[in-house]
Swiss-Prot record:
This is Histidine biosynthesis bifunctional protein HisB. The active site is at D9, D11. Residues 1-166 are annotated as: Histidinol-phosphatase. The lineage of its organism: Bacteria, Pseudomonadati, Pseudomonadota, Gammaproteobacteria, Enterobacterales. In the N-terminal section; belongs to the histidinol-phosphatase family. In the C-terminal section; belongs to the imidazoleglycerol-phosphate dehydratase family. CDD domains: HAD_HisB-N, IGPD. Pfam families: Hydrolase_like, IGPD. The gene is hisB. PANTHER family: IMIDAZOLEGLYCEROL-PHOSPHATE DEHYDRATASE, IMIDAZOLEGLYCEROL-PHOSPHATE DEHYDRATASE HIS7. It is found in: Cytoplasm.
Length: 355
């Protein structure tokens, strides 16, 4: 799983920057920005790793002796550490702009090691700083930038923005048989739009979204002039992939879910978002079709979905009416999924440390 990083400026962002000389070279100049420590703790808990990156003009020269810098800086680091804030690394450019070095922000020399790592989640990593050069650094790194300001984008605002859940995924799957576009919003309800060309299948997919408590949009163009096989199978593959992507690092999810009855049917569903695809399925139908959906494709749909989503899924139904039996499977799955994707904390629900 790729890692989220926050590359954070020091003066003017973590601590106040003296307007007189822009140097924190005495203990009485050291002052933390409002709310910085609790918000950094919140961000760490949400899975971000912290890296401090700062330009310190002329550090080690007569105008800014190293000893004058070290005292306040070391105290700052001790306070952060004592409160549980851990920086993976502190990156410092000591040069003046006139030196034309290759490590001064917004140049990327200091962060080249992170850029070389395939493990960095660039879509969810940020540079946070109070200057235009910090935003330029973010652009040069190919990640997001947040310009800190006490009034317009302060630490509580940043903490809220970066920890607010809005799990989303967009998957496009094109083959010779089907063209499929799936969007999933796990933290929004209502407004689902589904068009696969198979009316009863659309109704069943809507049951997953409705009872799962999330929104999805699915558009499919398939070779229905042959039959519904490729349409149903490939929709399952695309939807499973979208759900997996939307779940992200899975921190805080319940992971497990189970549900039982519907009408005269007894539908059993047990789900584990385990990362290990497996399906146990038991359902018998009187007819080959319900509406325009082939009943033999129902198992195929759930098998395809469980494979790309990476879940262990047990589904079973008994009843008298084929329509109700089919619907009970989709409703039970949706309701079970609702339990499993619900966020209750910040930790990964696995003793192995990975899902």
């Amino acid at each position: 799983m790729s890692q989220k990083y926050l590359f954070i400026d020091r003066d003017g962002t973590l601590i106040s920057e003296p307007p007189s000389d822009f140097q924190v070279d005495r203990f009485d100049k050291l002052a933390f920005e409002p709310g910085v420590i609790p918000e950094l703790l919140k961000l760490q808990k949400a899975g971000y790793k912290l890296v401090m990156i700062t330009n310190q003009d002329g550090l080690g020269t007569q105008s800014f002796p190293q000893a004058d810098f070290d005292g306040p800086h070391n105290l700052m680091m001790q306070i952060f550490t004592s409160q549980g804030v851990q920086f993976d690394e502190v990156l410092i450019c000591p040069h003046l702009p006139a030196d034309e070095c290759d490590c001064r922000k917004p140049k990327v020399k200091l962060v080249e090691g992170y850029l070389a790592e395939q493990a960095m989640d660039r879509a969810n990593s940020y540079v946070i700083g109070d200057r235009a050069t910090d935003i330029q650094l973010a652009e040069n790194m190919g990640i997001n930038g947040l310009r800190y300001d006490r009034e317009t984008l302060n630490w509580p605002m940043i903490g809220e923005q970066l920890t607010k859940r809005d799990r989303y995924a967009h998957v496009v799957r094109n083959t010779k048989e089907t063209q499929i576009d799936v969007q999933v919003w796990l933290d929004r309800e209502g407004g689902s739009k589904i068009n696969t060309g198979v009316g009863f299948f659309d109704h069943m997919l809507d049951q997953i979204a409705t009872h799962g408590g999330f929104r999805m949009e699915i558009n499919v163009k398939g070779d229905l002039y042959i039959d519904d096989h490729h349409t149903v199978e490939d929709t399952g593959l695309a939807l499973g992939e979208a759900l997996k992507i939307a779940l992200g690092d899975k921190r805080g999810i319940c992971r497990f879910g189970f549900v039982l009855p519907m009408d005269e049917c007894l539908a059993r569903c047990a789900l584990d978002i385990s990362g290990r695809p497996h399906l146990e399925y038991k359902a018998e139908f009187t007819y080959q079709r319900v509406g325009d959906l082939s009943t033999e494709m129902i198992e195929h749909f759930f098998r395809s979905l469980s494979y790309t989503m990476g879940v262990t899924l047990h589904l079973k139904t008994k009843g008298k009416n084929d329509h109700h039996r089919v619907e009970s499977l989709f409703k039970a799955f949706g309701r079970t999924l609702r339990q499993a994707i619900r966020v209750e904390g910040d930790t990964l629900p696995s003793s192995k440390g990975v899902l």
